[in-house]
Amino acid sequence: MDADELWAQGVAQYLLEVKANPQTVAGLWAFETSVQADPSDPKRLFFLATLLYHAGRHAEAEQFYRQVIEAEPESGHGYLELVLFLESAGRRGEARRVACQAVMAGAIWADEWQRPPIFVRGLTSKPWWAREDFPWAADLEGAYPAIKAEMLELFGERGDHGGKMPQSWVRVGDERASQDGDIVAPGGEWREFLLYSAQDQSKSTANPEVLKLFPKTCELLESLLPGAVAMAKIGVGEIILSAISPGTKLTPHCASSNVRLTCHLGLVCPEGARVRVGPDLGTWEEGRCIFFDDSYEHEVVNDGNSVRIVLLIRFWHPELPAEKWLSTLNSGMEEYSAMLQRRVSPPASSRVAELLMKAEGSPVIVQKGSPLNSA
């Protein structure tokens, strides 16, 4: 049995199982044996690497991802999957080295520290941005007393206290939260109060409860940053109050895309709380804004004695014109869907259809001892 026939047999086995079990490794032996006979197809190498990862054979998966890069050094797919693999294993230094290779090859990304799965070329890449880059920063900082007063009033109504974690807020990781709790290191606590998010039914304003609690804050945000409000409404970003307890660490991670930037307005900023974006550290100051690109590797640590609270605003990258927001978003969603599809779709030939029809609902069997040159 030659390499192509073995691969087709493996695909047929896989397709018969994958709908019932998306994490199936059916057909793995046939895929491996096919690639041993003919390792020249990078698409086959890519799929085999993914299947080996699901099988828990991580060292072999890594080896095949590296072979994909060697076979297609100007394609970003292998670099991206290897970087995600290394990051999931906590091997961030190695992930940066692979990203550096990708940048030098012109395959994907512009900086080894900036590794989002969806990367739009042509946008300025830098971890930190200056306040002077955003004229609206002064207006937001000018509203700091009113914003903080409304937050403290909320604390009073709900029995929370200014120096402690607001227990009435949603814990990040909860199904009602806007962000992923996986990055909170064990023992930490991260809570949020959503001002604008995809959970709101209105397309242009906050929900009635939020408007009642934060009338001045919402009026300012809707007049000053309508694009950021719209971004939050469609689920690409969010505008929230973000609280991190003392002793909490948010582990290093990269956001999914470089189409947005992040603003933090400091509301409660203890000494010892800090954020690293790329290789550089930053801190917060009450009443002041900081700006960074969260598609860069970043982490947050609160070694202070009290809670750290900021007003967090995601907004479109300033070099992305408004008329391109939706088309860029749609392209990014298509790119992300294609990435997911590559992981579950082995390259197939017409021979696979023949095998599936022949199977008539019965598993396609490939014997482990079958010689490669059998008919």
Question: How would you label these PLM feature ranges?
Answer:
Residues 33-34, 67-68, 102:
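Canonical positions in the second alpha-helix
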Residues 261-266, 289-291, 306-322:
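A short hydrophobic beta-strand segment most commonly corresponding to one strand
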